[in-house]
Amino acid sequence: MKLWSCLLAIGLLTLGGCGRSRHRVLEVAYVSAPQATLRDQVAAIYNRVGTVKNGERVEIVDREKRFARVRTATGIEGWIEQRYLVDQKTFDGLQKLTQDNQNAPVQAPGILRNETNLHITPGRETEHLYQLASGSKVSILKRATAEKQATSVKLPAKPTEAKESLRASSGPALEDWFLVRDAEGRVGWVLSRMVDVDVPLDIAQYAEGQRFVAFFVLDEVQDGDKKVPQYLCLLTEPHDGSPYDYDQVRVFTWNVRKHRYETAYREHGLEGVLPVTVTQESFGKEGTLPVFILQVKDNSGNTIDRKYKLNTPIVRRVLAPGEVPARPARPLRKRR
């Protein structure tokens, strides 16, 4: 009797040990595919035991070649291709990116043209986790460039050096990327050509072949029974890889008498960098006026601030003490 009891105890301990080994957690992973099937075995013929969705947390309990056996939060276990999973480091990186840009100012709203992945850094081959649906609305925060099919970000030391690199036929092809925030507050990098900057139609028609990068409402004017916004717009040439985020600034004000937008101010030849600050400031007898501050690079590649004020319909530079303008501001009333 004692012998049988001992054998039974040893058998139970052995089975328990095997069970723990079979179901031990190797690591935590997250599903990067829009949706993936869990299969009961790694074979050409299998049964579906469950489904996991994008961003879902799973525990890896076993691996076999290109497959991983995972356990979901509900306890379902099954095999999934490892290419549909990303590790904890990638998840933590996206969480940090979101936290670091939680309060980053919005430069423009955008709409996704296609299903798009949120990457942890600019580049088509960089790690990504979340996938956004076509038509999703996002907030554009920043811009960067990356080499096509490369993971490294192109960060030119000086604008002049970058321009020479772009002109060189042997130079790498660059793509523009936007740092965006989605409706759920998640932040990541997306290929800029996948995003349409959601510019109001009333001013989009004045693009003149240039690309809108960002726009801001400076203030509103009363026209009859409605208020009409007046805009600051940042534009650039319609190609990727520029060493600056924008090179043109335009201000569109509303002509109350003619009921139309007019170009109150434009400036070219800038090497502007996002973000742009829009605020209000008191100017004594002029009252409280809309103010915008641009960050631009000088000839040495240093980033400096340039402040402007709008006293409708005139835009003027606001010079810092001792500052001398390189060239006078040129207010315009010509319709574009």
Question: Where do the protein language model's features map onto the residues?
Answer:
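Short, Lys/Arg- and Gly-enriched loop/turn segments at beta-strand edges
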Residues: 65-71, 146-157
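Short beta-strand elements that form the blades of beta-propeller/WD-repeat-like
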Residues: 228-242, 287-298
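Positively charged n-region of N-terminal signal peptides that target proteins for export
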Residues: 1-5
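Hydrophilic extracytoplasmic domains
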Residues: 265-336
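SH3/SH3-like (including bacterial SH3b) beta-barrel domains
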Residues: 25-26, 40-63, 120-143, 149
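Boundary regions of SH3-family modules and the immediately adjacent low-complexity/disordered segments
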Residues: 19-33, 59, 71-110, 154-227, ...
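Core beta-strand residues in small-molecule sensory/regulatory alpha/beta domains
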Residues: 38-40, 106-109, 113-121, 141, ...
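C-terminal motif of bacterial Sec signal peptides marking the signal peptidase cleavage site
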Residues: 14-17
